[in-house]
Amino acid sequence: MEPLQSNFHGSSEETTASVVAALTALHAANGGGDAMDSAAFATALDASDPLRDFRARFAIPQHGDEDGVYLCGNSLGLLPHDTRDVVQGQLDKWARGGVKGHFEEPLPWARCEEALPELMAEIVGCSPECVETEIAVANSLSVNLHLLMAAFYRPTAERNVILIEAAAFPSDRYAVTSQIVHHGFDPATSLVEVKSPATANLMDGGIIPTETIIAAIDANKDRLSLVLFSGLQYLSGQYFDIPTVTAHVHAINAAAPAGTPPIIIGWDLAHAAGNVPMHLHDWNVDFATWCSYKYLNSGAGCLSGFFVHERHATAYEKHPRLAGWWGVKFEKRFKMEHKVRALLLLSPRLVFLPLRTAHSSPPSLSPTPRRWTSPPAQLVSFAPTSRRCWSRA
């Protein structure tokens, strides 16, 4: 049976109609015998699901004596069965060799994060040739959001507004509000919210039409410094039209007089990564960040990923960034050199990888390391899964 296809970016009515049409087609393809709302039809769909084997790879919370139906992946993904063995292996290595674990296979801690960007690339839409310059895995989402804004939110007296959706996830609101205050501006005037025209209740979420977002951008374009939206709205489930909104921001920048500071477009993909198809490089997104413990099933509080388009990779003067030890290339990382600033300014690509300026080494004993080992680790499995599910999206 073919994967269900739906209209990701339409209105709520269009999306619902698209899903109903897809289910109706599946019902017909399945013979149409059992009612669409019957347990028998649901069981038949499960049996013909091309991804049905993946369920067995996870520990499913119990409901009574049976496996439950887990609908909480938006908060925390499930535990892959191989996690215990991988983490125990690293604990054994620590006990056996102490500091030698930094360089001992499998999973030497000094390099344990290096496989992750390539695995993330297909999930968020980055071509293999751009992985080195566009994707990094480090820190938490909020920390990465602050690091990205440290580089890209460069407010001036004339341009200091950040545009967000009104029902943005609280951590995003806290981050942008504190950035505005940090730069000496007032959130009352420098934070603009785009509301759903369908509801006055913030916690209802509500669908925000793409044209409403574009109208808000146009209305504030002379004051905007940054547009920061969720890729997928956590209350309403709306998958925002990332390519259209991003292209509109870039069109404004292209039409602006020479010397005008560009409006930056960034995306929080916490509820999108591993959930919906994305093509961040082709969409020309300036930056994005996401967590890994929801639909990527890495464990509570595990590492975040972030994307910066390759055109910004060496724009150090235009977008100065905060740096850290793990931003130094591996061959120089343990030489403990102190002339980093001079070397960075003279030849950044020789000293610092374009993006991987994590503040320090990654947490090698969190549940995350299972994703850096051989299959069937969850993130390794996502690549073929994404090709099978999203190839026509």
State where each predicted segment sits.
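Pyridoxal 5′-phosphate
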Residues: 2-393
